[in-house]
Amino acid sequence: MSDQLILVLNCGSSSLKGAVIDRKSGSVVLSCLGERLTTPEAVITFNKDGNKRQVPLSGRNCHAGAVGMLLNELEKHGLHDRIKAIGHRIAHGGEKYSESVLIDQAVMDELNACIPLAPLHNPANISGILAAQEHFPGLPNVGVMDTSFHQTMPERAYTYAVPRELRKKYAFRRYGFHGTSMRYVAPEAARILGKPLEDIRMIIAHLGNGASITAIKNGKSVDTSMGFTPIEGLVMGTRCGDIDPGVYSYLTSHAGMDVAQVDEMLNKKSGLLGISELSNDCRTLEIAADEGHEGARLALEVMTYRLAKYIASMAVGCGGVDALVFTGGIGENSRNIRAKTVSYLDFLGLHIDTKANMEKRYGNSGIISPTDSSPAVLVVPTNEELMIACDTAELAGIL
């Protein structure tokens, strides 16, 4: 292990994922997962060399408390003084950032201005930055924007059909998210296929509690499903995805809800959870559906049908498709979701080999389409932490 370690922080609305990455080897020295940080049941789990230890965050139910506990763990293992820089995943960087950036006060001001665009994520991201600055004074902090990868989209893909004045005044456009994941997965898929990335018309489906799909042509994002905020597009764990905007006015007029209540419902109570009335967790729903739970069955049907429609539409952006790639927690592990989705797409020449689909789970990457089939279908586990660490080291001048 070298003395050039990068701390990567990924603060969600109620979670904290942390990883200490060795700059030289790219290996994970220590990782942590803080969960339910906004509740009295907050806990943080540390993983060092495969040994896990869970600690309650009693009285520290916030991101700052979780970072403080992480600091204690680093000191316990003699890692604190080896940390040379800190990288942060930032959900929404607005129009300004097309690449990662060293964080100063001007950047913090921009991130605060983007809070209305990602109200669930940016406040948590900012909390993580402030906590890191407090606990690691003097170290450089780097922001890696989830939106930056999609700044290459053509105007026809990112423009909303609303008056120009509104678009300009409020920077009202499609931004896209999961860009850090796409930056890692796309070249990995190209490596597996043995072809230059620039020669592959690729569609990547990042499927987790949040989910999006991106069309990549000539190695660049040309279209994506998430939009002005992360709610647009696919059916997600608790987010509705695409929905008629008229729902807002209808519910405020007829259901006695205000805009904030509708927004909370569409972000936190919809998606798989809303349809199934059971869970936002795909694993739970797959088991329940097999046992005859109608809500779970319908939720998975709606999810996979919507996903297949988006895959077909992204082929327009690419001008065809050479490879479909699944990533993210669901994409990497759920053979049933992959198989059901691809079953809708045989008209595009997409097929799945049942044996390969069964094998490519739990961290295993590779091709899951038949050997004589084209386009290819792949599974590629993402590694956003490594991408963030690489950007952080480069901008912080850590060679």
Curated annotation (Swiss-Prot):
MF terms in GO: acetate kinase activity; ATP binding; magnesium ion binding
Main localisation: cytoplasm
Disulfide bonds: none
Name of the protein in its database record: Acetate kinase 2
Catalytic activity: acetate + ATP = acetyl phosphate + ADP
InterPro entries: Ac/propionate_kinase, Aliphatic_acid_kin_short-chain, Aliphatic_acid_kinase_CS, ATPase_NBD
Cofactor note as given: Mg(2+). Can also accept Mn(2+).
Annotated gene: ackA2
Record: residues binding substrate: R89
CDD domains: ASKHA_NBD_AcK_PK
Known function: Catalyzes the formation of acetyl phosphate from acetate and ATP. Can also catalyze the reverse reaction.
Gene Ontology CC: cytosol
Active site: D146
